[in-house]
From Swiss-Prot:
GO terms for molecular function: metal ion binding; phospho-N-acetylmuramoyl-pentapeptide-transferase activity; UDP-N-acetylmuramoyl-L-alanyl-D-glutamyl-meso-2,6-diaminopimelyl-D-alanyl-D-alanine:undecaprenyl-phosphate transferase activity. Belongs to the glycosyltransferase 4 family. MraY subfamily. The chain crosses the membrane at residues 21-41, 73-93, 94-114, 132-152, 168-188, 199-219, 239-259, 263-283, 288-308, 338-358. This is Phospho-N-acetylmuramoyl-pentapeptide-transferase. It comes from Vibrio cholerae serotype O1 (strain ATCC 39541 / Classical Ogawa 395 / O395). Its cofactor is Mg(2+). One of its GO terms (biological process) is cell division.
Length: 360
């Protein structure tokens, strides 16, 4: 929005040329989203407390979590608000990639909102029926997948980029739709599974978003794309503004979500952020790098799959509890230790993911 205003005023005030620079808009995007989150935080927490919208804690969970019962949840609303407002202000709204990410962010946020509402307001611990949650996640992902395929069919935007191999970029064809579907839905649910401790999900989300900001910038710059032997995708650099908005909003939320948390993001935040990360990975053609950088999310998801599979096939559990962060809690690790160590793992994995762009 502001970029349009700047274009109108440029002939009269040279200062407004500054708004054309992606680097400037990326910086102010972080600051804007951070400011909105910090401003909304206390007000939203107070409002949630007044409405008695508190966290529902499973009785079979770790005993240390019983003290979290009643902590305000659905704080993801302020994350989505901060991201959306920031993107509308600072991004180029003629860019279809920006709208693709916003569509998934808000669509999945709506699904998560209904799920949270049923849990904490209707006092239904199961929330939205699983098949309906999966149906709406699938519907949104498929609509976006078909739209992106139609927009970039048989171009670099629908190639598969394989890490470590600079000349391996097969054209996916219709398999692009299938891959896009699984990346968006899978990442959304993976982030949701990770969101079980104070700050555990939001910090890796911030780190992965920061990593994708760098990747989006390189992918949208023909010189850097050629240098790194990755597909040059015109206009993908505008996703830098979206990624930095996620970074700023996430850091602002972390201010209130750090241990001991004053508010939880709920499904409205976790499903939306995961879906947005998956969409960005698809748009910049770095699905494999998402698996590396988002390794904490992958680890949490695999722990659940292995736990359920082992119990059904052998009647035995592999972990004391899944997702795996609960396993370490039950081993006696204090919650802050689990959180910070998972953060450290995430930092290392993001750096490895970025390194794969050069190691080819």
């Amino acid at each position: 929005m502001i970029i349009w205003l700047a274009e109108l005023l440029q002939p009269y005030f040279s200062f407004f040329r500054l708004f054309e620079y992606l680097s400037f808009r990326a910086i102010v995007s972080i600051l804007t989203a951070l400011g909105i989150s910090l401003w909304m935080g206390p007000r939203m927490i107070k409002r949630l407390q007044m409405l008695q919208i508190g966290q529902v804690v499973r009785n079979e969970g770790p005993e240390s979590h019983f003290s979290k019962r009643g902590t305000p949840t659905m704080g993801g609303v302020m994350i989505l608000a901060a991201i959306t407002i920031t993107v509308l202000l600072w991004a180029d709204l003629t860019n279809p990639y920006v709208w693709a990410v916003l569509a998934v962010l808000l669509g999945y946020g709506a699904v998560g909102f209904v799920d949270d509402y049923r849990k904490v307001v209707r006092k239904n611990t199961d929330g939205l029926i699983a098949r309906w949650k999966y149906f709406w996640q699938s519907a949104i992902a498929l609509v976006v997948a078909f739209a992106l395929y139609a927009h970039g069919q048989d171009t670099a935007a629908t190639q598969l980029v394989v890490p470590f191999f600079k000349d391996v970029m097969p054209q996916l064809g219709l398999m692009y739709i299938v891959l896009t579907y699984f990346v968006i839905v899978g990442t959304s649910n993976a982030v949701n599974l990770t969101d079980g401790l104070d700050g555990l999900a939001i910090m890796p989300t911030v780190l992965v978003a920061a990593g994708f900001a760098a990747i989006a910038w390189a992918t949208g710059n023909v010189n850097f794309a050629n240098y790194l032997h990755i597909p040059y995708i015109p206009h993908s650099s505008e996703l830098v503004v979206v990624c930095t908005a996620m970074v700023g909003a996430g850091l602002g939320f972390l201010w209130f979500n750090t241990y001991p948390a004053q508010v939880f993001m709920g499904d409205v935040g976790a499903l939306a952020l995961g879906g947005a990360l998956g969409t960005i990975a698809v748009l910049v053609r770095q699905e494999f790098v998402l698996v590396i950088m988002g390794g904490v999310f992958v680890m949490e998801t695999l722990s659940v799959i292995l736990q359920v599979g082992s119990y059904k096939l052998r009647g035995q559990r592999i972990f004391r509890m899944a997702p795996i962060h609960h396993h370490y809690e039950l081993k006696g690790w204090p919650e802050p230790r689990v959180i910070v160590r998972f953060w450290v793992i995430s930092i290392v994995l993001v750096l490895i993911g970025l390194a794969t762009l050069k190691v080819r």
